[in-house]
Swiss-Prot record:
One of its GO terms (biological process) is fibroblast apoptotic process. It is found in: Chromosome, Centromere, Kinetochore. The gene is CFDP1. This is Craniofacial development protein 1. May play a role during embryogenesis. Residues 1-156, 192-224 are annotated as: Disordered. It comes from Homo sapiens (Human). It holds the Pfam family BCNT. Ubiquitous. The modification Phosphoserine is found at residues 82, 85-86, 116, 216, 250. Residues 1-18, 25-43, 70-94 have a biased composition (Acidic residues). Residues 49-65 have a biased composition (Basic residues). Residues 95-112, 192-201 have a biased composition (Basic and acidic residues). Phosphorylated by CK2 (casein kinase II) in vitro.
Length: 299
C-alpha cells in the first residue's frame, strides 16, 4: 500500500481522456458533445451579463475530422465588417454632399448681398448732378478753344515768307553780288530793308539840285560833296576765305550734293567726327600730364 501511495498519479498519462479518431465517432458521443457545449454556453452567458450577446448569431459548432471548425463564424464576421465599412462610406459621402450644398448656399447668399449693395450704392456714385455736367461741358469747350488758338499761333510762324537779299562786296577790285533767301522776320532782312530806306531819299537829292536858286551856292556845294562822297564810297570788302566759302556754297547748290555731304560728315569717316575725336584725345592727354605734375609737386 505504501508503494501504491507513493506513486504520482497527477503526472500519469493513463488518466488522460480518450479521444477517438475521426472515423470512430458514434451518435452518443455527438449528443454528449452538443450537451456539453450548451452547458458551457449557459455558464458563459451568466458570467458576461450586461454585455452584448453574440451566442444567438453563432450556430452550433460542428465536428469534423481533425477537430472543430469556425468557418461560418469567420464569414459572418467578414460580412458584418463589410456592411459596417459600406455604411461608414455612405455616411461620409452624405456628409460631403451636405458640406458642398452648404458652401454653394453660402456663396449664393454672399453674391446676393453684394449685388444688393451695388444696387444701393452704385447708381448714386455714377450719376452726377446736372450742374456738374454743365460745368464739365463748359470747361471742355474752353480748353478746346484754347488748344485751337495755340495751334493757330504755332502754325503762323511756319507760314512766314522768305525774302531774297542781295549784297554787294568788293573782292580784288571786282564787284561780287551775293543773293540769299532769308526769313522776312530775321534781323538780317530787317537791317537790309532799313539800309534801302535810307538810300532812297539820298538818291532823290540830285534831281532837286537844279531847282535851287543861284544864291544858294553853299547848299549846292554841300549837296554835291555828299553825293560824290557816296558815289566814291568804298564798298564792303570780301576776304579770300569768305570768297572761297561763297564759291563752295554755290557749287554745292548747283550740283545738289549738300545733303549727301552732310550725311557723310556725320559718319565716323567724316572730317568733323575725326577732328572731335582728336580733340578729346588731346584733352585727355593734357589731364594726365597735369595730374602727374601735381603729384610730383606734393611733398
Amino acid at each position: 500500500m505504501e508503494e501504491f501511495d507513493s506513486e504520482d498519479f497527477s503526472t500519469s498519462e493513463e488518466d488522460e481522456d480518450y479521444v477517438p479518431s475521426g472515423g470512430e465517432y458514434s451518435e452518443d458521443d455527438v449528443n454528449e458533445l452538443v450537451k456539453e457545449d450548451e452547458v458551457d454556453g449557459e455558464e458563459q452567458t451568466q458570467k458576461t451579463q450586461g454585455k452584448k450577446r453574440k451566442a444567438q448569431s453563432i450556430p452550433a459548432r460542428k465536428r469534423r475530422q481533425g477537430g472543430l471548425s469556425l468557418e461560418e463564424e469567420e464569414e459572418e464576421d467578414a460580412n458584418s465588417e463589410s456592411e459596417g465599412s459600406s455604411s461608414e462610406e455612405e455616411d461620409d459621402a452624405a456628409e460631403q454632399e451636405k458640406g458642398i450644398g452648404s458652401e454653394d448656399a453660402r456663396k449664393k447668399k454672399e453674391d446676393e448681398l453684394w449685388a444688393s449693395f451695388l444696387n444701393d450704392v452704385g447708381p448714386k456714385s455714377k450719376v452726377p448732378p446736372s450742374t456738374q455736367v454743365k460745368k464739365g461741358e463748359e470747361t471742355e469747350e474752353t480748353s478746346s478753344s484754347k488748344l485751337l488758338v495755340k495751334a493757330e499761333e504755332l502754325e503762323k510762324p511756319k507760314e512766314t515768307e522768305k525774302v531774297k537779299i542781295t549784297k554787294v562786296f568788293d573782292f580784288a577790285g571786282e564787284e561780287v553780288r551775293v543773293t540769299k533767301e532769308v526769313d522776312a522776320t530775321s534781323k538780317e532782312a530787317k537791317s537790309f530793308f532799313k539800309q534801302n530806306e535810307k538810300e532812297k531819299p539820298q538818291a532823290n537829292v540830285p534831281s532837286a539840285l537844279p531847282s535851287l536858286p543861284a544864291g544858294s551856292g553853299l547848299k549846292r556845294s554841300s549837296g554835291m560833296s555828299s553825293l560824290l562822297g557816296k558815289i566814291g564810297a568804298k564798298k564792303q570788302k570780301m576776304s579770300t576765305l569768305e570768297k572761297s566759302k561763297l564759291d563752295w556754297e554755290s557749287f554745292k547748290e548747283e550740283e545738289g550734293i549738300g545733303e549727301e555731304l552732310a550725311i557723310h560728315n556725320r559718319g565716323k569717316e567724316g572730317y568733323i567726327e575725326r577732328k572731335a575725336f582728336l580733340d578729346r584725345v588731346d584733352h585727355r592727354q593734357f589731364e594726365i600730364e597735369r595730374d602727374l605734375r601735381l603729384s610730383k609737386m606734393k611733398p
